[in-house]
């Protein structure tokens, strides 16, 4: 069976050290590695001068130093047949990539991990949210939408993804524990950019 190629297009900054690539977001390590189990995967991201802690175990990674090189990498994939495009979040880089893909009638998936409305409001201020909203409306109207939370998409036809990094060994040989005293406390990322709900 021929494995289909999936091109992941992300705003993620990636550090290159010889043949190794590192990113700062564990999701952007897990996603391409997980998809590569069943598909051929190419990952297009932005270059970084800072080495981050998550090594991405993937052979086909393209790192762009500017928007023109980024879009060049997207256009270069058009020579390949039977391909799908997987945009991660809505940013200017992924939006311009989307426009090119849409013009050439490519199959596009958009994966929304957080509310861009809230992030843009926090980072750039309330006045700039309308720019994000226009990009959001254009992309979700013309893509297959996948979300981590139903509130992230107003589109009725979206696919809810339940990310879990717990695999089978976590669920084997469970022991009864005493809940009288807390022995482990984990607090995930809580920040205004991602929204606190």
Ranges and model annotations:
Residues 48-76, 87, 124:
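A short, charged, and often flexible helix/loop element on the N-terminal side
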């Amino acid at each position: 069976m021929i494995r289909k190629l999936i091109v992941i297009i992300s705003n993620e900054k990636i550090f290159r050290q010889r043949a190794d690539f590192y990113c700062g977001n564990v999701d952007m390590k897990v996603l391409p590695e997980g998809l590569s189990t069943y598909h051929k995967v190419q990952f297009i991201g932005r270059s970084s001068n800072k080495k981050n802690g998550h090594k991405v175990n993937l052979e086909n990674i393209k790192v762009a130093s500017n928007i023109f090189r980024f879009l060049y990498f997207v256009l270069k994939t058009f020579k390949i047949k039977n391909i799908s495009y997987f945009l991660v979040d809505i940013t200017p880089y992924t939006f311009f990539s989307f426009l090119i893909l849409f013009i050439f009638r490519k199959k596009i998936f958009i994966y929304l991990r957080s509310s861009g409305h809230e992030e843009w409001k926090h980072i750039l201020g309330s006045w700039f949210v309308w720019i994000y909203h226009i990009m959001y409306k254009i992309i979700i109207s013309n893509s297959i939408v996948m979300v981590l939370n139903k509130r992230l998409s107003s589109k009725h036809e979206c696919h809810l993804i339940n990310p879990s990094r717990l695999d089978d060994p976590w669920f084997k040989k469970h022991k009864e524990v005493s809940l009288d005293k807390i022995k482990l406390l984990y607090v995930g990322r809580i920040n205004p950019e991602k929204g606190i709900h």
